[in-house]
Regions:
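ATP-binding glycine-rich loop module of kinase domains
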Residues: 349-378, 402-403, 409-412
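Conserved alpha/beta core of the MobA/IspD/sugar-nucleotide pyrophosphorylase nucleotidyltransferase superfamily
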Residues: 106, 118-127, 279-353, 359
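Double-stranded beta-helix
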Residues: 5-6, 86-123
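Conserved beta-loop-beta/alpha segment of the NTase-like Rossmann-fold superfamily
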Residues: 187-259
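Conserved kinase catalytic-core helix
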Residues: 382-387, 407-492, 499
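Active-site activation/catalytic loop segments of kinase-like enzymes and analogous catalytic loops
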Residues: 524-585, 602-616
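Conserved core of the sugar-phosphate nucleotidyltransferase
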Residues: 233-306, 311
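N-terminal nucleotide-binding beta1-loop-alpha1 segment
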Residues: 120-143
Length: 632
């Protein structure tokens, strides 16, 4: 089993160590050098695989020769001859030696290391992410979620930090506000990483702050480590952990940031939020090589982790490392980061109800602040086994599954495949169950509609309760239109366990294997596990009338309200327009009540309205009114 040893100048990868020999690969970063050293007993031969190096080696006369070496060159070091390797470029050495690996006497060392084995070099390096805070600067964005979980380029902010470290690093995460969500996300998104989760007992109020949070992690940070706040986003690689360093970015407003004075890439002074500060802002990420000094210097009672750097001269030296940086810690800066860090692909229409989607490599993750929502989804995944992908992670706030290779039915944009799915659904879904439907249908269609309408109107002015002219069509007030809820046939559902609950074309995948898969299924129907086939049919009808894949992007729709005059429009695919008549005829030919399906579709649009951002929510509301007014 290989072992990686991190050095101030790079790293060693030990491929074999036994009682006869040691075999290793040595990686030295350009411009760095090993100790000037000798061995009492160890005999070694080094072969230069890659790069250019200057090798110092004492000869038999006691003179240290200095020689440039290139790939293919090799040298043997006999004890007790002095030697050193200087990397002109990045180099890779292959070393075979006798097994006395701790036999080293350091005459001169840039990091002032002592002789023999350096214990912390043999410990795994670690990244510590501070996520405990409330995220107050993020306003309503953090009402449902920890700020470290806000999505950016389809993954959480903290994933951008985790992905900057090699798999050798352990990840220590300081948990506080919505900490269980953070823990579950990390486990689902990065199952191949070693995490240590630390619950911070005070993350709000007096005494709390980044300094206190990291102090709670101290027992796990008795070795060189990198620490970062959760809302720091960098686009360039992390530097090697070979010295103390601070991450910097140019600034002309030092009163807003801790700032550093830099000479020859070494930090010589440090100030916290002062108009007399310097030209480089500290960005909330740092490498701590001299961890003993860090723990001596930090003033936990101040709450400020930067207090560890107020007495900068107490460190041997701290290097300046410059990053391309986004501060995602305020609403404005988070929105800037969304524009600057890749193009986030919307996998669904944005919601405001605490649901979040992520895609990390081939893993698709659903997170919700509503635990019953997640537990219901997990339970129904078992019922839909064979129709939906198997879950790879099941938590209280998170579940995940492996991404299915294929296209959604919207992406297929092929009426033949859509027709094939209708045949598939009739064969593999909707098997009837003997179950009374009156009560669950009343709860789901009537009671939920009244609750959702109340929620929607609570966020709008009183004009939304009045009559409107919508796209030139006069419609009565919404409460008058909802007399449709008095129709008894609305509550005579077709019971089935094998319902989806959100059966629109974005939630149906046509796999590369020519099979159909259901994703993003509903957790229940009226609080129970038996659903109504008519609801699936109405959901599908709504997604045919309005392409939800288009609705992910705001430029594809508009809704203008001027008093009681309303005009809305949205784009769709010509193929969907042509499919409407086929679908309605298919419903009739299979003895489904088309008028009922249309009524349920109108109610679906109304129920969706309060769950989405304002303009799209308005569009859904007025689309519902328009449909309800046309139903006989």
């Amino acid at each position: 089993m290989t072992k990686t040893i991190y050095k101030p100048w790079g790293k060693e990868v030990w491929l074999e160590l036994n009682d006869k020999y040691c075999y290793k690969r040595i990686y030295i970063n350009a411009g760095n050098k090993t100790s000037y050293q000798y061995h009492h007993h160890k005999l070694e031969t080094n072969y230069l695989i890659e790069g250019t190096a200057e090798v110092w080696l004492e000869n038999d006369d006691g003179v240290v020769d200095k020689k440039m070496m290139n790939p293919g060159d090799f040298f043997t070091i006999e004890p007790p001859k002095k030697h050193r390797v200087i990397a002109i470029t990045d180099i890779i050495l292959q070393e075979v030696s006798t097994p006395e690996v701790n036999d080293v006497v350091r005459i001169e060392d840039d990091s002032n290391r002592s002789d023999g084995k350096i214990e912390h070099e043999h410990a795994r390096p670690v990244l510590c992410i501070l996520t405990a805070g409330l995220g107050k600067r993020m306003g309503g964005l953090c009402s449902h979620i920890n700020k470290g979980l806000l999505p950016l380029d389809n993954k959480a902010l903290i994933s951008h930090l985790i992905d900057k470290t090699s798999k050798d690093y352990e990840i220590v995460v300081a948990l506080g506000y919505k900490g269980e969500m953070v823990k579950e996300y990390c486990e689902a998104a990065h199952p191949d990483r070693k995490f240590i989760f630390v619950n911070v007992d005070n993350y709000e109020g007096p005494g709390s702050g980044p300094a206190y949070s990291i102090s709670q992690c101290k027992e796990h940070l008795q070795r060189p480590f990198v620490w970062a706040v959760a809302d720091t986003i960098i686009t360039n690689p992390l530097p090697p952990l070979e010295t103390d360093w601070l991450g910097l970015y140019p600034t002309d407003i030092p009163e807003l940031y801790s700032t550093a004075d830099v000479e020859d890439d070494v930090i010589v002074n440090f100030k916290d939020k002062s108009k007399d500060g310097y030209n480089y802002a500290f960005i909330g990420i740092a490498g701590v090589y001299d961890y003993s000094t860090f723990w001596k210097e930090i003033n936990v009672s101040s709450g400020e982790i930067v207090s560890a750097y107020y007495n900068i001269n107490n460190y041997s030296h701290i290097k300046a490392k410059y990053f391309d940086w986004y501060d995602a810690g305020t609403i404005d800066n988070y929105l800037k980061a969304q524009k600057g860090v890749g193009k986030t692909k919307q996998y669904s229409i944005p919601k405001t109800n605490g649901e979040f989607l992520y895609k990390i490599d081939s893993t698709f993750i659903k997170l919700s602040s509503n635990k019953s929502f997640i537990s219901g989804r997990i339970a129904r995944a078992k019922q839909l086994e064979g129709l939906c992908p198997p879950l790879s992670y099941k938590g209280n706030n998170v579940y995940s599954y492996q991404w299915i290779a294929g296209k959604t039915l919207y992406e297929c944009n092929d009426p033949k495949i859509w027709k094939d799915f209708l045949s598939f659904a009739q064969t593999h879904m909707w098997s009837k169950e003997p179950h009374p439907m009156q009560e669950p249908c009343v709860k789901f269609y009537k009671d939920k509609t009244h609750d959702r309408l109340k929620l929607f109107l609570s966020r709008r002015d009183s004009s939304y309760q009045e009559a409107h002219t919508i796209n030139g069509v006069k419609t009565p007030p919404i409460k008058k239109l909802l007399k449709v809820l008095e129709k008894e046939d609305l509550y005579t559902g077709i019971p089935t366990k094998l319902f989806h609950g959100d059966l629109q074309f974005d939630n149906i995948v046509y796999g590369d294997d020519k099979s159909f898969y259901l994703i993003d299924w509903r957790e229940d129907f009226g609080g129970g596990e038996i659903g109504d086939v008519c609801y699936d049919l109405a959901k599908m009808y709504g997604g045919i009338l309005m392409s939800y894949s288009h609705m992910r992007e705001q430029e594809n729709f508009s809704c203008i309200c001027s008093g009681q005059e309303v005009f809305f429009k949205y784009s769709t695919e010509p193929s969907l327009k042509g499919f409407v008549n086929f679908y309605e005829n298919w419903l009739k030919s299979n003895n489904f009540n088309v008028s009922k399906i249309k009524t349920l579709t109108a109610l679906i649009f109304l129920n969706m309205a309060p769950l989405h951002e304002k303009e799209f929510g308005d569009l859904l509301f007025f689309q519902s009114k328009l449909m309800l007014s046309s139903i006989e």
